[in-house]
């Protein structure tokens, strides 16, 4: 069997990237979520967690031994050098985890979904990039509704993510998600049919 090629799927908060990912899964495409990989590498018993505790102390653990993400975020928020240390520890481990899960794919192509595909350098692991793009007013509206957060909070998250034009610059394909769910699903099906004709992510 030929090795599946890898599609990078990304989009800003509230763009509909998760809904698109779910529909690709329903069509039988193997998908790896970078956010999940980031959680797996710091599970109890994994070497990364021991190193984090060694550096920051037991205060960043929950009573059940899991990583207290909020406490860790607080520790690194005002300390760029600590954040860099953490990134240097975790990024290679997350990358290795992603590669391992992508290797299990049995579909003609596999998807790596990541909100930080462009910023983290994870797009180097892909053959093609699909950006789910949404007008900013819809991103704000959807995220405020879904996460019950203020417009200010959503705007601060948007600022931390790659700028829309930066993401689009790296896109091979763009799915404009400015309609309802059935519109999004039709677009995913259209792209899926096209992707099945590709070899190595190229026509």
Swiss-Prot record:
Pfam families cross-referenced by the UniProt entry: CoaE
Principal EC category: transferase
Binding positions (ATP): 14-19
Residues in DPCK domain copies: 6-203
One cellular-component annotation, GO: cytoplasm
Key words, A-Z: ATP-binding, Coenzyme A biosynthesis, Cytoplasm, Kinase, Nucleotide-binding, Transferase
Cellular compartments annotated: Cytoplasm
Major localization class: cytoplasm
EC number in record: 2.7.1.24
Pathway(s) served: Cofactor biosynthesis; coenzyme A biosynthesis; CoA from (R)-pantothenate: step 5/5
Keyword Kinase tagged: yes
A Gene Ontology BP annotation from the UniProt entry: coenzyme A biosynthetic process
InterPro entries, sorted: Depp_CoAkinase, P-loop_NTPase
Signal peptide: none
GO MF: ATP binding; dephospho-CoA kinase activity
UniProt catalytic activity: 3'-dephospho-CoA + ATP = ADP + CoA + H(+)
Superkingdom of the organism of origin: Bacteria
Record family assignment: Belongs to the CoaE family.
Xref: NCBIfam families: dephospho-CoA kinase (TIGR00152)
Known function: Catalyzes the phosphorylation of the 3'-hydroxyl group of dephosphocoenzyme A to form coenzyme A.
Official protein name in the record: Dephospho-CoA kinase
Upper taxonomic lineage: Bacteria, Pseudomonadati, Pseudomonadota, Gammaproteobacteria, Pseudomonadales
